[in-house]
Amino acid sequence: MIKNYFKIAWRNLVRNKVSSIINISGLAIGLACVLLISMYVADELSYDRFFKDANRIYRVNIDGKMGNNQFVVGHTGPPVGAALQNNFPQVESYTRMYLPGDEIIHFENNGQKSSVTEKGLLAVDSNFLKFFNFPLVAGDASTCLNGINSVVLTQKAAKKYFGDASPIGKTLVFDEYKTPFTVTAVLKDIPKQSSLQFELLQNTASIPPVKRFAWSWVWLQMATYIKLTPDAAADPKLSILVILREIQIGMGRLKTGSL
């Protein structure tokens, strides 16, 4: 019986070659599109899921208006994180980051002095590694960024600067500051599925503009992340609505975007 079905199907395909080719091609293209879209969606949904408290972490955005122009930016003024934590019990903690831009770094390895232009530099608050729980291969996440002249490297960066030798305790000199920064920890290389990509971390306290504008609500250069308490995270929409209803700053209203 089944053999006859296949024979009939084959005869129909041969008899109607053009329509058969169109139908089979359409089916193949459709299946390929579904597969590609599924792979894309799965990849997008995998970003930042490895963070322990991913469901409680939100990035603070500014929804504002200048003249007739409406804008939304993913950066805030330096005081925003502390203000949220101090005024809203739903906010357990916060951390901030600042992108300094490319930096010429001088270093010495095996007696040979070299310089490189570093593009993967990120300035962060001292609690950054505890907030996001990036895994370390050397050093202490609780203290490695406490020093104003501390620097943390990824494994890739450590190898670039110091080869196979341990980088802990060694120094990098940032051309802008002319000051040695001591390597205090080494991170595992950042996963591709992380929206936060960097190779070196330094303390925001070492950045002159951050200190200069620490009071400013309209110096929108800091990426601010907040972590809701477990109770608030159980109903994050309600908790965030309470915060949004009560706070409005400078040029616009705070908004949040989840990881």
PLM regions: where:
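The feature marks short, hydrophobic/small-residue-biased sequence motifs that occur predominantly
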Residues: T76-P79, F88, M97-E103, N109-G147, ...
